[in-house]
């Protein structure tokens, strides 16, 4: 009987010219693939549509190649300090082409692993660009598909400003297409993407200028983190040139191919590469969402509820196109939980968008989880918030001429001083934060932090030995 129903369903699908799936996923990025493969574990039929390389932003032009380039730039810093540790090493030459070739080969292998994963999970991989038709089906290269449930996970693309000559620059995705290290670079933006790219280029030897609209970078992060990184960029020993309160007004390309960047505070000449890193827009316009009643905000982000439902029944969305926490692990977690809810009877399974840890691969590093000081004050009131802070010199730089500071902050609330925010600036922040994120998620208190015996000598021990709490200013 079950086989008869399957044959009947397939016959109807063929006769109607529409191929049907229990779950149709539009977008082969981290969130879409994670949700598709998890759905297959529950025995449903799944189709996945993608027009570009599998893996989406993270694998191809985001966190993975970015981390490779960050690691590369770290080696330049190590070489800088080698003499102070007794090594006779100098940086004679850096070959951008070598690391680009190795990085691109690594990404290509990951693309292949994603495709193998889909095949191994029996997810049907449909290559092409998707758009909703008037009848509610999804069209790809002239063929029609329909999902009993349809997931939109198409991600986003970099924003290009409406400025005269803006087309002479490249976007943050284009950074990974550069064939050589630019002799002089201008990066525009104050968010984590701009900060990371500028730091990599500056440390690898490009004369790099970071242009920010206001007086600080990372203004949405905790004030301590924003202040510390901005101050570090202002140091004479930092190879980066920071231009505060600066906006680009015009870009002029000369006959020699070099750019002149006119700004509100001056002119930067002989620029080989201009990189726009001012934000990202969702890739939703080409989907024709209005045909199926999916509502978006004014920026084009898909509006979803706490269960990832859109305004259209049976159509859901996760990832960057929802505008919530543009982070790969968030998209993966939301996508997998969604599949559990839709296909495994877990009707209340959803991602809670709280205490999500993140790291900025800046120079120095930043790690953060939970509420900022300002958010805690707004949520609980100033009288309920207690702050613990520490600023010190990491041991790595105890014997080097070059010095870097580290800074840490715990944001605690209530009489029991529940830790609701952990913010870390300095070497090692990326690797130390994950464990503290678990503690924050579990609701640990300052007393429990204090009862933890420190690992010495480490930077992380500061987080369990801080004393002298203060109130917000």
UniProtKB/Swiss-Prot annotation:
It holds the Pfam family Pyr_redox_2. Its cofactor is FAD. One of its GO terms (biological process) is response to superoxide. Disruption phenotype: RNAi-mediated knockdown causes a severe decrease in survival upon treatment with oxidants including juglone, paraquat and to a lesser extent, cumen and tert-butylhydroperoxide (tBOOH). Enhances further the production of gamma-glutamylycysteine and glutathione disulfide upon juglone treatment. Increases gst-4 and gcs-1 expression. Reduces lifespan. RNAi-mediated knockdown in a trxr-1 mutant background causes an arrest during larval molting characterized by a partial detachment of the old cuticle and an impaired ability to reduce cuticle components. The active site is at 456 (proton acceptor). The keyword Disulfide bond applies. Belongs to the class-I pyridine nucleotide-disulfide oxidoreductase family. This is Glutathione reductase, mitochondrial. It comes from Caenorhabditis elegans.
């Amino acid at each position: 009987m079950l086989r008869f129903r399957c044959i009947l369903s397939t016959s109807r699908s063929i006769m109607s010219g529409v191929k049907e799936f229990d779950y149709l996923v539009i977008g082969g990025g981290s969130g879409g693939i994670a949700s598709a493969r998890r759905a297959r574990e529950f025995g449903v039929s799944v189709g996945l549509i993608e027009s570009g390389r599998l893996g989406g932003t993270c694998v191809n032009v985001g966190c993975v190649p970015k981390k490779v380039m960050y690691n590369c730039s770290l080696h330049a810093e190590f070489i800088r300090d080698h003499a102070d540790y007794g090594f006779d090493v100098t940086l004679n030459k850096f070959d951008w082409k070598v690391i680009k070739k190795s990085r691109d080969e690594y990404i290509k292998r990951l693309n292949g692993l994603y495709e193998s994963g889909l095949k191994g999970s029996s997810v049907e991989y449909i290559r092409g660009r998707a758009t909703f038709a008037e009848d509610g089906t999804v069209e790809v290269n002239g063929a029609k598909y329909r999902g009993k449930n349809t997931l939109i996970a198409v991600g986003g693309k970099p924003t290009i400003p409406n400025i005269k000559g803006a087309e002479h620059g490249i976007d943050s995705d284009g950074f990974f297409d550069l064939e050589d290290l630019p002799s002089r670079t201008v990066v525009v933006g104050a968010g984590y993407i701009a900060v990371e790219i500028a730091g990599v280029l500056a440390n690898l030897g490009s004369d790099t200028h970071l242009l920010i609209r206001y007086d600080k970078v990372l203004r949405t992060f905790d004030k301590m983190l924003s202040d510390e990184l901005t101050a570090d960029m202002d140091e004479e020993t930092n190879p980066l040139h920071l231009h505060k309160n600066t906006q680009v007004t015009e870009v002029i390309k000369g006959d020699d191919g070099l750019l002149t960047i006119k700004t509100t505070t001056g002119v930067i000449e002989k620029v080989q590469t201009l990189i726009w890193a001012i934000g990202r827009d969702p890739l939703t316009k080409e989907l024709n969402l209005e045909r199926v009643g999916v509502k978006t905000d004014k920026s084009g982000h898909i509006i979803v509820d706490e269960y990832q439902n859109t305004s259209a029944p049976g159509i859901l969305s996760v990832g960057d196109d929802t505008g919530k926490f543009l982070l790969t692990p968030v998209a993966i977690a939301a996508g997998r939980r969604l599949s559990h809810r839709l296909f495994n009877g877990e009707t209340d399974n959803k991602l809670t968008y709280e205490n999500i840890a993140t790291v900025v691969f800046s120079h120095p590093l930043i790690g953060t989880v939970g509420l900022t000081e300002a958010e805690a004050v707004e949520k609980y009131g100033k009288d309920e918030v207690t702050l613990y802070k520490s600023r010190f010199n990491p041991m790595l730089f105890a014997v080097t001429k070059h010095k870097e500071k580290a800074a840490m902050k715990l944001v605690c609330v209530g009489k029991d001083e529940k830790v609701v925010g952990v913010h870390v600036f300095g070497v090692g922040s990326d690797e130390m934060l994950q464990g503290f994120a678990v503690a924050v998620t579990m609701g640990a208190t300052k007393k429990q932090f204090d009862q933890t015996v420190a690992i010495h000598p480490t930077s992380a021990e500061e987080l369990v030995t801080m004393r002298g709490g203060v109130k917000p200013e």
